[in-house]
């Protein structure tokens, strides 16, 4: 496995590759969710590249950039064990300049939900991914459904910038108890992990209601809020697969999303129906 730390090294590696390339962009602190993305990438491509870059432009002032979990040695070992072809681990000063052009996510997709709480976050996501896609030139990119809004915005960029890339949505990976895997779960103690389970349990309740033919989002939201107590709920949202707000559940074209705080840790989860 090649360990690449500069854009020049990545360019050189990519220039020598003629096979189909798959790419898994991450911020490191790799867990079983990331591993599932990498395994699918390896199954569907001849060359697999993984990036582990904690991108500063997608963090707001006061967020956890400095505290964000990092374990470079473990990330490298995981990728080696999975027989990844190259891991890209750049530094921020290698990746950004002061006077570079900016990319803005469309407000219709980025000013709501995560973007309402974290204004500018998705601009930073697109900024880094545009660079990474240009460097890695992948045929396939793999991203988790857990970040459903991000997935939609990235697909919008790929489509509108005429990038010849397939953005593949991968299923959410959960602990045995249902907790969605996240690098930020490391912030939670055992008591907080029990509270965090309220997110997935509220979504399971929503699914059970839909399975019983309930489509009224007000009924579903009320049931979810009851389960989420006493957490501070940021939002519960109901959208279609294009991230347009919906007034009732349409099975096969609906996503229910939830964001809530467990103490100071903000967690997100969703279910695709």
From Swiss-Prot:
GO-annotated biological processes: pantothenate biosynthetic process
One GO CC annotation: cytosol
GO molecular function, one term: ATP binding
Localisation per UniProt entry: Cytoplasm
Listed Gene3D superfamilies: HUPs (3.40.50.620), Pantoate-beta-alanine ligase, C-terminal domain (3.30.1300.10)
Binding site for ATP: 27-34, 144-147, 173, 181-184
Reaction(s) this enzyme catalyzes, per UniProt: (R)-pantoate + beta-alanine + ATP = (R)-pantothenate + AMP + diphosphate + H(+)
Protein EC: 6.3.2.1
Active site per UniProt: 34
EC class name: ligase
Keyword Cytoplasm: yes
Residues annotated to bind beta-alanine: 58
Keywords: ATP-binding, Cytoplasm, Ligase, Nucleotide-binding, Pantothenate biosynthesis
Pathway assignment: Cofactor biosynthesis; (R)-pantothenate biosynthesis; (R)-pantothenate from (R)-pantoate and beta-alanine: step 1/1
Subunit structure: Homodimer.
Role of this protein: Catalyzes the condensation of pantoate with beta-alanine in an ATP-dependent reaction via a pantoyl-adenylate intermediate.
Family label: Belongs to the pantothenate synthetase family.
Other information: The reaction proceeds by a bi uni uni bi ping pong mechanism.
The protein, known as: Pantothenate synthetase
The encoding gene: panC
